[in-house]
Amino acid sequence: MEKPGGDDGDWHLFNRRPLIDLAEPVLPARFRFRTAADVGPEAATQAHLDAWYPSSFPETGMAGVQATWPYRDDLHVLVEAPDGTLAATAIIWFDPVSRTAEFEPVGTHRAYRRQGLGTALMWDGMKRARDAGAETMLVACLGSAAHQAARGLYHGVGFRPLSRDIPYVQRHA
């Protein structure tokens, strides 16, 4: 931090919620839920790239993610638009030992934002995580006031702050 008590925005807020009292996900007409198991790894990769366009994440990087334990294509959730575009994406990482799952990352294609897709995707994803055996769900976001969109989404579906990190980086003049 630049000074004691300062907030330069470079910190993460970690959020948690129990997988109880889950709302039914609601999508706009003709949108539908899919998984990477349904659409294949190439389409799931494109959804990721579209959600964070422009992205420095290489197209080939998703193959490494998909090959990493505990990646499961049935827990890589997506929303498909009526025209076939994969409009929202989230990967759920599930640890069966701790019975905890984490959303990372969560994103919506820029042409489909502010339509409730992220909210619906998270409700659907939490139900899938619970059905897989999870009892607790986690998600992280940038924590400062300048980054309210993700925090608003996550808190809107019942996540509450668990902890935060503090970057210890010396600033050079």
Predicted regions and their residues:
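Conserved active-site tyrosine of GNAT-family acetyltransferases
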Residues: 1, 154, 159
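Acyl-donor-binding surface of acyltransferase catalytic domains
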Residues: 1-29, 166-170
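A short beta-loop-alpha structural element at the N-terminal edge
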Residues: 32-44
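A conserved beta-strand-loop-helix scaffold within acyl/acetyltransferase catalytic domains
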Residues: 49-110
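Conserved acetyl-CoA-binding loop-helix of GNAT-fold acetyltransferases
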Residues: 105-108, 114-131, 151-156
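Short acidic/polar active-site loop segments enriched in Thr and Asp
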Residues: 135, 160
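Conserved beta-strand-loop-alpha-helix junction that forms the acyl-donor binding cleft
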Residues: 138-151, 167-173
